[in-house]
Amino acid sequence: MLEHERIALSMIAFITGMMAFIESMIAVPAASTAMAADALSFVQHSVSAGFALRAATGFKRHRWTILLQGAVMMVLGALVCLIAARRLVQGSFPHPLTMIIMGFIALSANFSACTILLLSRRQLTGIMSVWRVSRADAVGSISVIAAALAVVATRSNIPDVVIGGAMAGLFVAQGWRILYTGRADANQMR
């Protein structure tokens, strides 16, 4: 593996991993379901970059790691769905200014990761999987900003809960798809 490839993937994994941590820690006091769901997207991006980094070193991804990734995605997505339901019932009001600021910080992290991808596109072997989750991260960050603006406009927590719940639901579905595909692949290899 080339040194610049390892550095690029390491930088992407670090940026997205830090954003996952920061956004998940700020989502709690901000009472934002959309931010919690967006943090999941960054977790997925960091894991994908990590697997691409390992694949570039000749590591063969074992079937159990695929199944584990799918199961973890489903569990985390389900937890955010439960948080959304609880916030809907309790009526906790998110902090829109915090959501907007974090949305723009997350977009800048996405921009940084995409810039690294574009500058390294000829060298990276696992670029397609990392690129797919980069797009999903950007959509998630824009959704956080949109949810914050809708919260301000409606003076309700419903936009944040709906957007965050929908993002988390997609995460559960994606985890299920990974589990299903991973099991099918494992059965074919027997």
Predicted features along the sequence, with ranges:
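Alpha-helical transmembrane cores and adjacent cytosolic helix/loop segments
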Residues: 1-190
